Amino acid sequence: MAQKIEGHINLNVNAGEATAAPPIGSTLGQRKVNIMEFCKAFNAATQSIEKGTPLPTVITIYVDKSFTFIVKTPPASYLIKKYAKVKKGSGATKKEAVVGKITMDDCREIAKLKMPDLNTKDIKAATKIICGSAASMGIEVVGN
């Protein structure tokens, strides 16, 4: 028989850096979940990912205070900034203030990484989504 779900928590946790400090500790503590058990399991699950990479995580908490979690791919904005080698996107939008450049191949690479979390199964459509995100961040996409 399936366990009863008490709730879901959405958190952005850096890969390999889960600790009992806020926001993880306070969020899980309110639900009376074993914080250290989550931190150990999360850090073990993300040890192959570059440390410090922000990862959207969905934690499912059951009535008996046990939990499961799903780690999603890093946000598109993080990957775009990483490929463009910039710290921050533009405060202005689109063509007003270009802060960096990425190639169409970079967009395709990011789209391949993000495919499980995007609402499309087509790589061309996924690439267009990533290009749109880059443009809204003030990062120019060059190439075809």
Swiss-Prot record:
Subunit structure: Part of the ribosomal stalk of the 50S ribosomal subunit. Interacts with L10 and the large rRNA to form the base of the stalk. L10 forms an elongated spine to which L12 dimers bind in a sequential fashion forming a multimeric L10(L12)X complex.
GO molecular function: large ribosomal subunit rRNA binding; structural constituent of ribosome
Gene: rplK
GO terms, biological process: translation
Assigned GO CC terms: cytosolic large ribosomal subunit
SUPFAM superfamilies associated with the record: Ribosomal L11/L12e N-terminal domain, Ribosomal protein L11, C-terminal domain
Function in brief: Forms part of the ribosomal stalk which helps the ribosome interact with GTP-bound translation factors.
Pfam families on file: Ribosomal_L11, Ribosomal_L11_N
NCBIfam families: L11_bact (TIGR01632)
Family: Belongs to the universal ribosomal protein uL11 family.
Processing and modification events after translation: One or more lysine residues are methylated.
Disulfide pairings: none
Keywords noted in UniProt: Methylation, Ribonucleoprotein, Ribosomal protein, RNA-binding, rRNA-binding
Name of this protein: Large ribosomal subunit protein uL11
Cited Gene3D superfamilies: Ribosomal protein L11, C-terminal domain, Ribosomal protein L11/L12, N-terminal domain
SMART domains listed in its UniProt record: RL11
TM region positions: none
